[in-house]
């Protein structure tokens, strides 16, 4: 196994074709491990950060990618140097992971741990936004435990998903009776008042139009609540727009549009990877206060996935929200994997982090360490 580190955008650009060929052959791939996601993340958010993308080759062929970055904590937080997933600042992937070829995963895990042990510049490794059932990182965790240097596993969030049945009626039958009743009532109300139609964005020109409409819908809704949204950040809007436009020609993006009497009322970004449809961002506006366009849109998107006959799962991503729990019967734990270097400084910081977490759980204000805002790193879910 031959490891190499890519440290700049030029090197990342050169990996495009190999990366795209490896991903479908890897364990548990998602759209958030695509080359398009990582390249555009570095374009938009990478200024001032140090790329550390570990590339693993076997007999010249690409078999593994570990997209890491260097991050130095501020001096009042100890000034520690962290190795972390590359997209954990500015814009966080709902599901972060490594990319290992399914036939070489054990060798890739061993090569990754060998690299980390040889790389002496880090005080702590922090891998946020990890699905606990990740096959690739599960193999890494097993190998680390075998070597006597296990990762700490810290619960972070929940990701909710639907195992798609053969029919939409079967999906509804699996819900609680009260939920099913409310969904039918809300959908029936829209159908009686309006001509409700769900369509799929066609040409790439429509993607730009619908994407901007979604952004405005999200901003309007959250301004009405007097709360900020991720879409208030121009960099966030720029990143997602570049990512969608870059991925769209591959057929991995669907923008679902709900119109009421011909006027756009809701838009849902669906990302496709293999047999899984990921419902990412959505925006909507209710023509009347009693209309439930947002939930009806999500239900219609799930129905669209069932009727497509090519998906086995519809993933609502990270964020354990009530509206998701009503629609999704399954969930997975999202965790942070953490490991400290065997140094006095790392041990002192680890102790301070434990104290900070205990203070936070007791209701006392934190004093540095791990408990500050943004440390959870959960995926965006619905903005």
Regions inferred by a protein language model and the residue ranges of each:
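Conserved GNAT acetyl-CoA-binding A-motif
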Residues: 121-130, 305-318
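A gly/proline- and charged-residue-enriched helix-loop-helix capping module
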Residues: 86-121
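Hydrophobic, well-ordered secondary-structure elements that form the walls
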Residues: 262, 294, 298-301, 305, ...
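Hydrophobic pocket-lining residues that define ligand/cofactor binding sites across diverse proteins
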Residues: 116, 247, 305
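Active-site/acyl-donor-binding loops of N-acyltransferases
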Residues: 1, 5, 9, 70, ...
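A short, internal acetyl-CoA/4′-phosphopantetheine-binding micro-motif in the GNAT/acyltransferase core
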Residues: 94-105, 282-290, 320
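Conserved acetyl-CoA-binding loop-helix of GNAT-fold acetyltransferases
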Residues: 104-115, 290-302
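A conserved beta-strand-loop-helix scaffold within acyl/acetyltransferase catalytic domains
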Residues: 3-85, 127-290, 381-382
